[in-house]
Amino acid sequence: MKIPSEFDPIRPFEPEELPAVYDRILADKQFQMVLAYLYPDVPVEAIAKKMHACKTNLEFQKTFCYPFLQRLVTELSLGCSMDAVNIDTRKRYTFVSNHRDIVLDSAFLDKLLMDVGFATTCEIAIGDNLLSQDWVRDLVRINKSFTVERALHSVEMLRASKRMSEYIHFAIAEKND
């Protein structure tokens, strides 16, 4: 699907962009330190190979995010579930949550959507104020997040809000991912 170019600065990465983004984050020293912490016995080269094998955002989520979240549930909680008996997994939905933990709450929602049989995960709005590192900005866009531009003056903020609103409408009405 061709996404209008005006959304390029805020939209999630598309599959054809992923290889270059993987290379960029894998070259980042701070990201390498995070990988060494999360995967102490796995060489960065092996992680890079596994990452490059992920041809879509969803494959990346299933390969890296889902196992990490499952480990959190298993080791640090009594469980995490979703009653989806009245939800048609073939339809699209808009989920709205509070501002408690933007990254973790939405990550668990993605995990639960996979658990109950949705073919894809959600796109997540995240403020640019939380994306101070380039590798973090890239990682959330791999993970299907779109950026809410916050650090703007009033006229710019109005334009950015309009663009974000148009992107959300586009994502709901036209994207099937």
Where in this protein do the model-derived segments appear?
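Membrane-anchoring hydrophobic helices of lipid-metabolizing enzymes
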Residues: 1-93, 99-110, 114, 121, ...
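Short beta-strand->loop
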Residues: 97, 125-128, 150
